[in-house]
């Protein structure tokens, strides 16, 4: 039985009074609150509440309050989107409450059950996957590629802490050093393969933090809410729900988790097998933290030191188990996930995971494609006002969803053509309808960054206004631009595009263009997406 100090009891009494929740009745009872913080069941005249005392040692960290504040703001977003969560109460405009230098969260008490890790059902995995999918769908964005932040840990250094680790733990750690080195290499590999996306996610949404009222789940303990990569977050949590933590991995449970997730959020990515290294990362970091606790770092009691020892031993065993099941899980991820459904996506869809795609091909034989009646193709002429050309170009690209705002279009125009407007006559083409309105565009150009020294011409910024799509305008326009590139002396063409414009990729493929070999390697996951979205089979 956990004994609560009188000082702690008095702080909680004071907390409830200052929060306006009344005097305590029926005592303050400790309940399971995880490994990091302490939790109490508190009953007052106003109701029953859960009170969480945040770990004082953690709160001393310079970044702690900022991290909690960020989680609180994201928790509010989940509340607004009506996700099934148990949020911290907002009292006097604040979620976190400070009492005598200690920090607390107060929650309405929820009667329910935490499912034992050993008895989780496939249905529960499916429902948990749905919640995570709903969470990720709220604010999913493609973002700039970031350098992986993981720094390998030299676990052998803990063996040098003479007398600080108990002998049994030292021996166990020594036995697993090679394995720890190997899995950290896998983490680094996964970091290089990880596409750059950002979503709201809860990295701690494992079974211990989902409470069930019958068959209805509620996510609790949301302090780990943050922006994260959806593919990594999904894989890490799915593996846990599938039984890996209890050394009883179930392929069926992992597939159920994926099924629920992909029903609520799908960015088209299907190369999760490349990311298995991330399954280890949180456990590597958890092991480092607990070895530190076991060695007496950042602990305030012998009890916490012993907890660090036991958690270190558990984590070493778990990392070993995860390495044993890795081949089985990789095979399942590569072959058994539901395929991407093209009908769920627009022709230009920013919800899709972004990969740069590069086609190339010969300009020796350019096919002819008839332009539908009532349309004509015209190149920009020298007597046209550059501002009008820019305006028409941006409006077409914006209609095709290349940009969300006119300002984004101006930024792209300035980057590609702003200092080169004198080159656009005879290179930039438009399709005009019967009224003379410009409805599609493409440009015969080159690599503006000067990296491509092959002498190939580049096909730039192909776009058709949304209301004109599906009328057969793109292929005749592309053919006209390719012929112009040939007239300019080019024998090859390169076509930069991306997975978010997957239907355009199909057009290029159908016209006979094929991936640049280097891009087929660097964007292999993107080409796998195109295989499922557009039937482009190059892998």
Where does each model-flagged region fall?
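A cross-family kinase active-site recognition segment
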Residues: 118-173, 198
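Active-site activation/catalytic loop segments of kinase-like enzymes and analogous catalytic loops
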Residues: 231-266, 280-299
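Conserved acetyl-CoA-binding loop-helix of GNAT-fold acetyltransferases
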Residues: 461-464, 470-487, 506-510
């Amino acid at each position: 039985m956990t004994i609560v100090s009188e000082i702690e009891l008095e702080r909680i009494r004071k907390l409830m009074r200052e929060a306006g929740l009344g005097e305590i009745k029926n005592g303050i009872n400790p309940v399971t609150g995880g490994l990091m913080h302490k939790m109490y069941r508190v009953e007052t005249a106003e109701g029953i509440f859960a009170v969480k005392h945040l770990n004082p040692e953690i709160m001393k960290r310079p970044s702690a309050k900022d991290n909690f504040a960020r989680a609180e703001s994201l928790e509010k977003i989940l509340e607004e989107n009506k996700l099934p969560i148990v949020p911290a109460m907002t009292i006097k405009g604040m979620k976190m409450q400070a009492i005598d230098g200690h920090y607390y969260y107060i929650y309405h008490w929820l009667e329910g059950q935490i499912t034992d890790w050993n008895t989780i059902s496939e249905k529960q995995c499916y429902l948990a996957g749905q919640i995570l999918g709903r969470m990720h769908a709220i604010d999913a964005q493609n973002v700039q590629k970031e350098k992986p932040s993981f720094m390998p840990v030299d676990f052998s250094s803990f063996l040098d802490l003479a007398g600080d680790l108990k002998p049994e733990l030292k021996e166990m750690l020594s036995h697993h050093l090679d394995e720890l080195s190997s899995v950290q290499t896998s983490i680094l590999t996964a970091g290089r393969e990880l596409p750059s996306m950002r979503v709201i996610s809860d990295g701690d949404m494992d079974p211990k933090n989902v409470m069930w009222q019958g068959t209805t789940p509620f996510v609790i303990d949301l302090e780990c809410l943050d922006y994260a990569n959806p593919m990594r977050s999904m894989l890490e949590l799915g593996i846990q729900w599938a039984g890996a933590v209890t050394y009883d991995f179930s392929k069926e449970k992992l597939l159920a988790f994926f099924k629920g997730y992909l029903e609520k959020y799908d960015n088209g990515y299907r190369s999760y097998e490349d990311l298995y290294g991330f399954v280890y990362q949180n456990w590597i970091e958890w092991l480092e933290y607990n070895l530190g606790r076991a060695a007496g770092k950042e602990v305030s009691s012998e009890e916490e030191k012993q907890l660090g020892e036991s958690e270190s031993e558990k984590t070493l065993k778990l990392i070993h188990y995860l390495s044993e099941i890795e081949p089985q899980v990789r095979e399942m991820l590569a072959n058994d996930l539901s395929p991407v459904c093209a009908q769920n996506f627009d022709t230009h869809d920013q919800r899709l995971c972004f990969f740069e795609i590069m086609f190339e091909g010969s300009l020796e034989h350019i096919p002819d494609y008839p332009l539908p009646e009532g349309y004509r193709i015209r190149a920009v002429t020298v007597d046209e006002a550059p501002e009008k050309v820019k305006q028409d170009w941006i409006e077409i690209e914006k209609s095709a969803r290349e940009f969300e705002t006119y300002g984004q279009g101006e930024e792209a125009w300035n980057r590609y053509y702003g200092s080169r407007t004198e080159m656009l006559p005879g290179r930039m083409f438009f399709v005009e309808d019967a009224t003379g309105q410009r409805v599609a565009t493409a440009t015969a150009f080159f690599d503006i960054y000067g990296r491509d020294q092959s002498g190939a011409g580049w096909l730039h910024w192909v776009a058709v206004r949304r209301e004109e799509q599906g009328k057969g305008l793109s292929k005749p326009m592309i053919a006209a631009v390719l012929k112009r590139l040939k007239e300019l002396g080019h024998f090859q063409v390169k076509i930069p595009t991306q997975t978010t414009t997957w239907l355009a990729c199909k057009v290029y493929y159908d016209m006979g263009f094929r991936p640049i070999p280097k891009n087929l390697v660097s964007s292999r996951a993107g080409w796998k997406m195109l295989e499922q979205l557009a039937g482009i089979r190059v892998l």
